[in-house]
Amino acid sequence: MIIGIGSDLIDIRRVEKSIERFGERFTHRCFTEIERARSDKRANRAASYAKRFAAKEACSKALGTGIAQGVFWKDMGVVNLRSGKPTMLLSGGAALILESLLPAGHRPAIHLTITDDYPLAQAFVIIEALPESL
């Protein structure tokens, strides 16, 4: 059962300007350690950060909160499954909101797709409730 859908489109140049202006203050405020480690290794660093920023926005929309109601930027992080497929790892307020959305006897599955084509980055999130028996 689908419990939330969110999408976001961001201009990579906006993220480039934030990195230039605020540097680590920006990246440490909005991104997890895992996200920073991955993005800082990329040739297209700003595009990598922009995709992750869009994923956080899309995820917050799928949760139905936006970046509010106790949900903070670093409560949502892009991680990769063993297969390489991206997903979201939630903690703090985001994890609490997700838990409150799940029907009894269900576990969450967060589906994420991210892409970029300069100057745009896009993310799409679907949050699904799966029976715990599956």
UniProtKB/Swiss-Prot annotation:
Reaction equations catalysed: apo-[ACP] + CoA = holo-[ACP] + adenosine 3',5'-bisphosphate + H(+)
Residue stretches spanning the membrane: none
Enzyme class: transferase
Names of required cofactors: Mg(2+)
Main location: cytoplasm
EC number: 2.7.8.7
Binding-site list for Mg(2+): 8, 57
Keywords (A to Z) from UniProt: Cytoplasm, Fatty acid biosynthesis, Fatty acid metabolism, Lipid biosynthesis, Lipid metabolism, Magnesium, Metal-binding, Transferase
GO biological process: fatty acid biosynthetic process
GO CC annotation: cytoplasm
InterPro entries tied to this protein: 4-PPantetheinyl_Trfase_dom, 4-PPantetheinyl_Trfase_dom_sf, ACPS, Ppantetheine-prot_Trfase_dom
Pfam families named among the record's database cross-references: ACPS (PF01648)
Any one GO molecular-function label of the UniProt entry: holo-[acyl-carrier-protein] synthase activity
Localization of this protein: Cytoplasm
Family to which the UniProt record says this protein belongs: Belongs to the P-Pant transferase superfamily. AcpS family.
Function field: Transfers the 4'-phosphopantetheine moiety from coenzyme A to a Ser of acyl-carrier-protein.
Name assigned to this protein: Holo-[acyl-carrier-protein] synthase
Species annotation: Rhizobium johnstonii (strain DSM 114642 / LMG 32736 / 3841)
